Structures are given as structure tokens and as C-alpha cells.
Amino acid sequence: MRPHTRAAAALFAIGYGANQFSSLMVMYREQAHYSAVTVAAFFGVYAAGLVPGLLLGGPASDRWGRRRLLLPALVVSVPASGVLALGGVPAVSEPALYTGRFAFGVVTGIAMAVGTSWVKELSQAPWDPDADAGAGARRAAIALSAGFGAGPLVAGLLAQWAPLPMELPYLVHVVLTLAVVAAVVGVPETRPAGAFRSGLRVHLPRRFRRVVAPMAPWAFGAPALSFAVQPAALGSRLAGFGLVYATLLTTVTLGVGVVVQSWARRLSPVTGSRLGLAALVAGLLVAACAAALGSPVLAVPASAVIGAAYGLMLVAGLLEVQRMAEPAQLGGLTAVYYAVTYVGFVLPVALAALSGVAGYPVLLVGVAVLAGVSLAVVAWTGRVREPVELPAAG
């Protein structure tokens, strides 16, 4: 197995573990009888660990090396899954779920920033001299997205039809991760340890602020809208099938995203961003129609279009970051990019809070309008070729 493939396997494993909880949220509401607010808090505490994991892990790997950060993150994800498996034990269920989700947030943040940078560096000479310039971004995005999709698919199916529904999904992740750890141990280090150039500060080029930042929140906001908001918008139409349906939408969204990412290599980052935002607008309008008609069937193609938008935007953002980042700050800038993408995860919470005022069909149209504004901004600012910016000395 080539070095970049083994590093990408780490991204797959961490994405699998991080997102397996998505399809299990319905189970905790229906079988463990947690309120919707409590289950949302389980989801939110993950973000509380993720952001510091990203913002500290990326720059730290620029200083100490990729393998020294990624391997411990993978190892810690094993007991984190073990703690989540205690969610089925009534006496410790709630604190176990909070603790496990927070731990997963931290290790996912570290692994996403470090693993993406590592895959990029292993997708060039001397490790892979035949790879094209965008191979690193594409490989990292596909591996992460495949993990994000496989985790909830397997977990949802096991929770629906296998024994031990609150334990077995996490055990599968533990076995997978142990195998990946063994594969990653021998991957070459691409970033030798050295002195910090500027502590933990990360230089943000003007193009990042003008082109990448307006698009980035939609990269993860898109799938969140697809498989978190649509089931909620359809409500009673899913009686008895909520877990399976949420798993279906998650799989369609992320599966289409993976397929599109393989094709996105042919596009420039700006074109990918524009097409991604345009697809998101279209997908949200279809989702609004599905919510207005109460049609679970129509929500499936909406998820497919939104998944295509996700795939295009994630790759486009990573390509922009990897082109503009200095080698010494690749991990740090990648971390900032991912941190901004996760801003999009507030959208389901915001729409849930507003649903009593306007209703999901109207809210989804409103979000489509906001995505259209972002499309206009990116289309305008992306026309200008920015001069290369270097961080200030010292």
C-alpha cells in the first residue's frame, strides 16, 4: 500500500468514527428517550472539542511533524468509541455520551488538519512524483468523505437490525481503527521537527479571506442541511422509519459527494466553488419543495444535488488552501479552513429554532437565497488573481 493511501486510510477511519453518531441520534431519541435538545447537545459538544483540535493540531504538526500528531489522535479515538458504547448503560449513559463526543471532536480536529496536510505532501515528489497538482486535495477529500458516509451507513444498519444496537456500531470502529493504526506506523514523515516560525499564529492570505472564507461554511453546511434538516422537516411522514431514512439521506449525500470529488479534479478551484454553490442553491430549492409537499421521495434527489455541492466545494477549498499555503504553514491554514467549514453546522440548529416561526419550506428558501449571495461574492472576488502574500517576518 502506497504511503498516501495509508495516510488517507487514517482520514477514512477518523471520518467514519466522527460521523457514525449522525445516524444514531434518532436511536438515542427513540430508545434512550433523550429529548431533542439533549441529543442536539451531544452533537454540539463534538464541535466544542473539534475547533481547538483543529486550530492547535494543524500548526503543531507544522512544528513537530505529521505522524507524531496523527498517530496519537487515531489511538485516542479507540477509547473514545469505547466510552460512547457506554451510552447504552443507563447509570452512566449521559456523561459517557458527552465525554465520548467531546473526545471525538478533539481527535477529529487534529486528524483532519494533520491528515489532509500529510496526504497532500505524500502526493508529490519524492513519494509520488507522477501525481498531478491537485491529487493531494482530491485524495484527502475522498477519503474523509468516504469515512463520513460509511460510518453512519454501517452504524445505522447495525442499530436498526443487529443485536446490541448501542454498542456494536462503536466496536466496528474500534476494530477498523486498530487496523489503520498498524498501517500508518510505517508511513514516511514529511515534515521534520523544527522551530515555530510564528508560534501558533497562521497567516491568512487575502485570497483566503475573499474567496475561500465566503464559500467554506457551506461545504459542511450543505450535508448538515441534507441529512439533519430534511428528516426534521418531514416530521410525522417518517413514523417508524426515522433511523433508516436518516441513514439513507446521509449515504446519498456523502456518496454523491465522493463520486463528484473524483470528477472535480478537472475544474479550477474557482469554477468548483461556483458550481458547488449553484448546485447548493438548486438542491435547497428542491428540499424546500419536498418539505412543502411532505414528500420523503423528493428529498432523496435533493440530497443527491446537495451532496454534489458538498463534494465540489470541499475539494475546491482544499485546492485553494494547498496552492496558497507556504509549506511551513500548510497544516495551520488547512486547520483554519476546516474550522470555517464547520461554521455551517450551526444551520440545522438555527433552522430548528426558527421553524416554529416560519416553517421549514420558507426557511430552506431563505437559506438558498443566502447561498446565492455567497455565490455572487465568490464569482466576483474569484475573478481577480491575487498577488502572492508572504507572512510578515518575526
Tell where the protein language model's regions lie, with residue ranges:
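Helix-loop-helix hairpin linking two adjacent transmembrane segments in secondary transporters
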Residues: 135-188
